[in-house]
């Protein structure tokens, strides 16, 4: 059985969130939480919150044991971009793209064998 958690339109660039997501993909959830606690990236606490939500969903909705869960899917998609402008010299302006992410984590029980 699979349990899923999604955080949509999170204010972190997908490129930066993917760096952290690559560290935990395929790991056991306990190990993944430890990795996220020790990773000094802005995306770490956000991804940790989504992971804990997926674990809670697995325990509550499907009555799975948290100790036997593995991260089967972990990916970051691009959300809507907030377009802003930075004033420059001589009346010009430069575009600033504030990117957002959709973070998805799927956990399931570890296969025996």
Curated annotation (Swiss-Prot):
InterPro entries reported in the protein's UniProt record: Ribosomal_uL22, Ribosomal_uL22_bac/chlpt-type, Ribosomal_uL22_bac/org-type, Ribosomal_uL22_CS, Ribosomal_uL22_sf
Record GO biological process: translation
GO MF annotation terms: rRNA binding; structural constituent of ribosome
SUPFAM superfamilies assigned: Ribosomal protein L22
Record Gene3D superfamilies: Ribosomal protein L22/L17
Gene Ontology annotations for the cellular component aspect, listed alphabetically: cytosolic large ribosomal subunit
Any Pfam family: Ribosomal_L22
Keyword annotations of the record: Ribonucleoprotein, Ribosomal protein, RNA-binding, rRNA-binding
HAMAP family: Ribosomal_uL22_B
Subunit and interaction comment: Part of the 50S ribosomal subunit.
Free-text function comment from the UniProt entry: This protein binds specifically to 23S rRNA; its binding is stimulated by other ribosomal proteins, e.g. L4, L17, and L20. It is important during the early stages of 50S assembly. It makes multiple contacts with different domains of the 23S rRNA in the assembled 50S subunit and ribosome. The globular domain of the protein is located near the polypeptide exit tunnel on the outside of the subunit, while an extended beta-hairpin is found that lines the wall of the exit tunnel in the center of the 70S ribosome.
Family: Belongs to the universal ribosomal protein uL22 family.
This protein's name: Large ribosomal subunit protein uL22
Native species: Bacillus pumilus (strain SAFR-032)
């Amino acid at each position: 059985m699979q349990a899923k958690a999604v955080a949509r339109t999170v204010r972190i660039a997908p490129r930066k969130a993917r760096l952290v997501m690559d560290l935990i993909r395929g790991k056991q959830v306990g190990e993944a939480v430890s990795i996220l606690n020790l990773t000094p990236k802005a995306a770490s606490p956000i991804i940790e919150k989504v992971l804990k939500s997926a674990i809670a969903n697995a325990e509550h909705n499907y009555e799975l044991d948290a100790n036997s869960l593995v991260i089967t899917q972990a990916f970051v998609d691009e959300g809507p971009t907030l377009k802003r402008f930075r004033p420059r010299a001589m009346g010009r302006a430069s575009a600033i793209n504030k990117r957002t992410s959709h973070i998805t984590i799927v956990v399931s029980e570890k296969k025996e064998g």
